[in-house]
Each structure stands twice: as structure tokens, then as C-alpha cells.
């Protein structure tokens, strides 16, 4: 199974949807705890499913099981928790949750442009360890 990850920051709507379509993404899995963000208006929870379906024929789901807890996110963003410690604690949170079943061609969505500093890379690696999954960062 191929699992993509994508961050929408620093992308125009055209770039974002073209990348998804050009790579054959079938489902966007939104793993943001708060998906009403205004960093890019086209990614708001109330609009994104419609845009994905209408522009590219791509499905949408919101999976909080793959989002960090509020406390962990605050420790990372506001209190300076190093990313490696954040990743370790996030994996421990994942161990306590039921992971969603993803389809081939799913793309984990978050805001960060760089997967190396985003929880989507931790989530993708975690899921890859649980099965036959190839991770591709878009």
C-alpha cells in the first residue's frame, strides 16, 4: 500500500490539488486536531471535502486518532519540547488508540510544509511499521 503525506502551507490551491491529482491520491486523511484553520482557506473542514471531490474526485476523512493530544501539541509548540521527544510521546499516544483503516493512495494532511517537523511523518512511519506500507512525502 502507498501512503502519502502532504502539508498545505506555502502551497496555492492550484498547487495543492494538482499535487494530489498528479500522484493518484484517492483519499485525503485530515490529521489536524483543529481543522477549521485559516492558514489556507481551501483547507477548512467545511470546504475541503467539497473541493477535493469536485476538483479531483478525491475522498475525505478526518481522523483524530492520528492527531496529537492538545497537551502534547502545546508542549511541542509553546514549551519547546524537542521533536524527537514529541515523536516518542506521540507514538505512545498512538499505542493507546485504535488506528484507522486506510485505503491505498491515502494522503495524511497537515499544515506544516516540511514533513520532518510535522506529526504526519510520525503517523506515517507508525502506520508503515504496522503493515506493508510505502510512505511518500509530497
Give the ranges of each region predicted by the language model.
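Residues lining hydrophobic/aromatic ligand-binding pockets adjacent to catalytic sites
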Residues: 1-138
Amino acid at each position: 500500500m502507498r501512503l502519502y503525506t502532504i502539508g498545505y502551507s506555502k502551497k496555492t490551491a492550484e498547487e495543492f490539488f494538482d499535487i494530489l491529482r498528479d500522484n493518484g491520491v484517492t483519499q485525503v486523511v485530515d490529521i489536524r486536531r483543529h481543522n477549521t484553520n485559516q492558514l489556507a482557506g481551501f483547507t477548512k473542514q467545511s470546504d475541503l471535502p467539497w473541493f477535493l471531490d469536485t476538483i479531483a474526485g478525491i475522498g475525505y476523512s478526518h481522523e483524530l486518532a492520528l492527531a496529537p493530544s492538545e497537551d502534547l501539541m502545546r508542549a511541542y509548540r509553546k514549551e519547546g519540547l524537542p521533536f524527537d521527544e514529541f515523536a516518542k510521546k506521540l507514538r505512545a499516544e498512538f499505542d493507546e488508540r485504535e488506528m484507522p483503516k486506510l485505503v491505498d493512495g491515502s494522503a495524511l494532511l497537515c499544515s506544516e510544509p516540511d514533513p520532518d517537523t510535522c506529526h504526519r511523518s510520525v503517523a506515517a512511519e507508525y502506520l508503515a511499521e504496522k503493515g506493508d506500507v510505502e510512505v511518500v512525502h509530497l
